[in-house]
């Protein structure tokens, strides 16, 4: 048995796993989809370095293929002058070689009608020089060249041993390992989807899995020695040490080894990594697990598979044995690598297979020598042909190539290797340069009338790109003034909805709310028992039943059949009919004010009494009607230690003193009627609501941050947004990211309720924000799949405003239909000529059609993030591609509001942008593939087919159309309207944003209103004065056309 680990070793293992997991992107449950940069763990590096690291870690593409960029360039979406300038800058770093014009050579590579790299890895410069000179490949140690180097580079000591064995013996150990781990994860992490659940999950992942694995007969029959391994390592950290020592992996390689193991299933690892840090996640508290558990399970399985393979196939049982095989049987290893892992040359498979099966060492050596020579020749010829094509396109004489020699060929290959790495970033910068010019060309200096006219209504929308169309159309159809603000309206809340038993965080994922808001029926009186019961959910982990127990299985089946037919054949009409069957949601209001200590104490007392009643019934069989309030009070006081002596249980019910004492102890420990838990409950209840000062601060901050501090309209609309679609696991990805993947209605209701309070307005008046008595804040919801806006809490609307309500609704309705008419052609290219009414009906039908894989494009197409006054872009059509954050630097003398905008909305916007970028450039590795093959896993994620890694990122239907990118993967272009030095100080003050700007994860523009709107762009490590390219007029917006 492994010796008990000392504390230092335990901490070292945990720390190593923690660091190894940094490249693993976090994965939130699908029901609250959170956009996230897949390379978040690499954001400390500059963008270009991070994507190169990710290419190796995720085995993924990080830029689009060259031919796609060429297509964009032909459509006018790239700045040719910028591309030529970047190419020329790179050419200056190349060594001078007689006869080679590097600018023309690299331009020829750029224009080649192929996605192939100009550089062939492992092609020898000496061999390439011979090919170009028309000579034979030189003799020499063929074994020591090319193929040998490729094999050793592919099998480093930190690569998982299962993969290494697969590479030489053609086994399937790594895939088998993935399958076993996924099955174990499904069993443990299931959230009431499966009919069978792993027992003992409260112990934690590794302990529960180990208990099951010890008794798993199928593994025993297969010959997997799981039990023997577990006997050596009862704890997860001990198991990791035992396996790594058994495999002979040197400790200096553990971190890299762990990273590779975790990234094999980065979806599951990312979910567990998020889950272990989510303190309020119900399932995480109930069934704990962390990446040490996950890695331990994986490594134990890996060791068992490796040992089984060693027994049956005579493969190495550890890394030292594997390395010995590479050294002592290099010829055999080379042939095995060529057959199972390398790029096998045509016509060699049967010869190598026969030799490995039946031949002696001498024949294997000769075959390896012959194959290596042929491998060298093929790679050299391939590289030579590429160079000849480039030379022909660049106008370089053939004689120049023939005269290169080995040294010259090495210099050429080194330049092409560097260019192959950097070419993608060159294309990216050229496209971004054109996009920057396109944005700046539409900017106008906002008009500031001396006496501002009072608009009919002001509307605060989420900064989400899908709000841009609706805002623009609303301003065009009527006297509306719109603003952009983060969709949680600056108020982070935990929310407990009516009839719900768990809390939802309505704020960005990087924020943890301190305050809790309850939704309660308007009919409930504060002193009633129902109200106390509602608050009880705050203190207990309760879950609602998914299907009512009063409905029979047959009835469910019949209703499901109706659903299937209705949602497919007539989705809109069926939705209207079906909604009549659902119980109506009662009229509710939000509990926003803090509870007094007396109110909180009465709630705790009521809950304690309820728990004692339950204890009497469950533990002693004494029903409620047999006890009165005085008896319950006596038991409560005894349990809390406020009184001593015998209780009614002895006097009235004849219990022995021993049984009475045991019952009181059960009430204290099991039912938690004790002083310490009462204090905890009081702290929990203290989270409910906001103090008056908090409410004033949140309203002041929200209004000031967007520049709305005077000239209020009668209506101030607070429009959150959400989505509606059928049969869509990714529905929450279409909701509000600023609200933690939920819709924004509750956040709108919270701020509206605060802003409408007379006490709040009175205090706001003292700090410079005077909201007129005839102004009313109205919450609403923009459903992005249908482009509709519905207003809420109109029952509270003052009677004097009712006369204007129809005008308000008509304006919103007209804007909705115009927005639908813009959006439908992006979904259905054949529907370009639809009238607004027709388009509006089509999007409503699509949102209720459960066969629809793309009810909307969501945030696909996002490109810009504008921080400034609405007047900058009010006359521009940004085609639903821009986040629009209202901001007036003149109301922010210290820059604190700008810092908050940068630290919050801009960072979230960058997450959204990067999620779309990487899901587009490689949907297989960074995205989640096609929805068609998705199955829900455990109610928190999706898999491809029945068993796979959890699919992270966005599905193909969100970012691709007909196999080509719909979303144009460019970095987020952030434009800030503020004086240059003022904006720079704000950026410097927020460390995360400073890193993103300097690392070029976002492209940043400062638009200085004190210098006649002069633009400064951060590039090459400095702020540069920017002038719009003369060729800007050729830019087109393909995203909104077929």
From Swiss-Prot:
Keywords of this entry: Cell inner membrane, Cell membrane, Membrane, Metal-binding, Transport, Zinc
Matches recorded under Pfam families: DabA
Reported cofactor(s): Zn(2+)
Keyword set includes Transport: yes
Disulphide-bridged cysteine pairs: none
Function, as annotated: Part of an energy-coupled inorganic carbon pump.
Family named by the database record: Belongs to the inorganic carbon transporter (TC 9.A.2) DabA family.
Subunit structure: Forms a complex with DabB.
Name of this protein: Probable inorganic carbon transporter subunit DabA
Gene field: dabA
């Amino acid at each position: 048995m492994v010796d008990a680990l000392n504390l230092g070793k335990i901490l070292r293992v945990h720390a190593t796993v923690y660091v190894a997991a940094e490249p693993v992107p976090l994965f939130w449950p699908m029901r609250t989809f959170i956009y996230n940069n897949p390379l978040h763990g690499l954001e400390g590096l500059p963008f270009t370095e991070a994507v190169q690291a990710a290419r190796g870690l995720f085995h993924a593409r990080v830029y689009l293929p060259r031919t796609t960029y060429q297509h964009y360039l032909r459509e006018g979406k790239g700045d040719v002058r910028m591309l030529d300038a970047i190419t020329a800058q790179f050419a200056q770093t190349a060594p001078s070689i007689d006869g080679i014009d590097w600018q023309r050579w690299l331009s020829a590579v750029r224009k080649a009608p192929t996605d192939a790299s100009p550089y062939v890895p492992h092609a020898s410069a000496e061999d390439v020089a011979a090919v170009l000179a028309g000579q034979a490949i030189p003799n020499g140690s063929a074994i020591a060249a090319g193929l040998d180097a490729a094999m050793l580079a592919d099998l480093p000591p930190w690569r998982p041993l299962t993969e290494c064995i697969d590479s030489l013996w053609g086994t399937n150990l790594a895939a088998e390992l993935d399958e076993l781990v996924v099955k174990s994860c499904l069993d443990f992490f299931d959230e009431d989807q499966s009919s069978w659940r792993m027992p003992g999950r409260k112990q934690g992942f590794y302990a529960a899995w180990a208990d099951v694995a010890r008794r798993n007969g199928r593994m025993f029959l297969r010959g997997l020695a799981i039990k023997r391994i577990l006997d050596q390592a009862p704890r997860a950290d001990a198991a990791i040490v035992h396996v790594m020592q058994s495999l002979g992996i040197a400790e200096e390689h553990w971190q890299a080894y762990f990273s590779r193991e975790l990234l094999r299933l980065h979806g599951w690892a990312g979910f567990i990594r998020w889950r272990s840090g989510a303190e309020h996640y119900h399932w995480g508290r109930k069934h704990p697990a962390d990446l040490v558990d996950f890695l331990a399970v994986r490594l134990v399985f890996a060791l068992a598979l490796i040992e089984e393979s060693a027994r049956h196939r005579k493969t190495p049982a550890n890394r030292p044995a594997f390395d010995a095989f590479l050294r002592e049987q290099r010829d055999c290893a080379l042939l095995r690598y060529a057959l199972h892992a390398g790029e096998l040359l045509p016509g060699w498979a049967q010869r190598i297979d026969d030799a490995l099966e039946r031949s002696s060492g001498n024949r294997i050596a000769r075959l390896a020598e012959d194959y290596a020579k042929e491998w060298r020749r093929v790679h050299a010829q391939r590289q030579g042909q590429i160079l000849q094509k480039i030379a022909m396109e660049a106008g370089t004489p053939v004689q120049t190539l023939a005269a290169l020699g080995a040294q010259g060929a090495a210099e050429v290959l080194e330049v092409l290797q560097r260019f192959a790495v950097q070419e993608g970033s060159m294309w990216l910068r050229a496209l971004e340069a054109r996009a920057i010019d396109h944005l700046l060309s539409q900017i106008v200096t906002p008009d500031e009338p001396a006496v501002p006219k009072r608009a009919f209504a002001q509307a605060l929308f989420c900064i989400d790109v899908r709000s841009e169309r609706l805002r623009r159309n609303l301003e065009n159809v009527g006297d509306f003034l719109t603003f952009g603000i983060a969709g949680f309206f600056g108020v982070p809340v935990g929310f407990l909805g009516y009839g719900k038993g768990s809390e939802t965080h309505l704020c960005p994922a990087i924020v943890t709310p301190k305050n809790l808001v309850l939704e309660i029926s308007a009919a409930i009186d504060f002193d009633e028992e129902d109200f106390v019961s509602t608050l009880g959910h705050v203190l207990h982990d309760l879950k609602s039943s998914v299907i009512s127990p009063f409905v029979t299985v047959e009835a469910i089946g019949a209703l499901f059949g109706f659903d299937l037919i209705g949602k497919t054949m007539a989705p809109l009409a069926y939705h209207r009919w079906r909604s009549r069957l659902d119980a109506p949601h009662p009229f509710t209001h939000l509990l926003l004010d803090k509870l007094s200590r007396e109110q909180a104490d009465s709630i705790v007392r009521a809950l304690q009494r309820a728990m004692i009643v339950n204890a009497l019934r469950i533990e002693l069989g004494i029903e409620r009607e047999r006890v009165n309030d005085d008896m319950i009070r006596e038991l409560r006081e005894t349990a809390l230690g406020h009184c001593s002596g015998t209780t009614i249980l002895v006097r009235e019910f004849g219990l022995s003193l021993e049984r009475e004492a045991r019952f009181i102890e059960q009430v204290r420990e099991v039912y938690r009627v004790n002083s310490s838990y009462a204090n905890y409950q009081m702290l929990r209840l203290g989270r409910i609501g906001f103090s008056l000062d908090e409410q004033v601060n949140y309203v002041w901050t929200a209004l000031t941050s967007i520049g709305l501090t005077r000239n209020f309209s009668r209506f101030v609309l607070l429009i959150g947004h959400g989505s509606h679609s059928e049969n869509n696991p990714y529905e929450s990805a279409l909701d509000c990211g600023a609200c933690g993947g939920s819709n924004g209605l509750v956040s709108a209701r919270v701020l509206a309720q605060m802003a409408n309070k007379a006490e709040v307005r009175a205090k706001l008046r003292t700090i410079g924000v005077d909201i007129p008595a005839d102004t009313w804040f109205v919450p609403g919801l923009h459903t992005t799949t249908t482009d509709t806006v519905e207003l809420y809490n109109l029952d509270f609307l003052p009677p004097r405003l009712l006369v204007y309500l129809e005008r308000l609704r008509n304006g919103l309705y007209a804007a909705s239909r115009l927005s639908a008419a813009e959006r439908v052609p992006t979904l259905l290219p054949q529907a370009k000529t639809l009238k607004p009414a027709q388009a509006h009906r089509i999007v409503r039908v699509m949102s209720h059609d459960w066969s629809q894989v793309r009810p909307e494009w969501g945030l696909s197409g996002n490109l810009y993030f504008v921080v400034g006054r609405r007047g900058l872009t009010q006359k521009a059509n940004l085609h639903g591609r821009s986040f629009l954050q209202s901001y007036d630097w003149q109301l922010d003398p210290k820059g604190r509001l700008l810092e908050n905008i940068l630290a919050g909305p801009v960072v979230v916007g960058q997450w959204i942008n990067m999620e779309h970028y990487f899901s587009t450039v490689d949907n297989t590795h960074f995205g989640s593939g096609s929805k068609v093959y998705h199955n829900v896993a455990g109610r928190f994620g999706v898999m491809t087919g029945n068993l796979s890694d959890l699919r992270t990122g966005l599905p193909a239907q969100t970012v691709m159309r007909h196999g080509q990118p719909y979303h144009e993967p460019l970095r987020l272009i952030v434009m800030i309207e503020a004086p240059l030095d003022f904006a720079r100080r704000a950026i410097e003050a927020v460390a995360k944003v400073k890193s993103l700007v300097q690392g070029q994860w976002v492209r940043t523009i400062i638009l200085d209103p004190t210098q006649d709107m002069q633009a400064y762009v951060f590039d090459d490590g400095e702020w540069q004065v920017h002038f719009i390219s003369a060729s800007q007029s050729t830019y087109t917006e393909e995203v909104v056309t077929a």
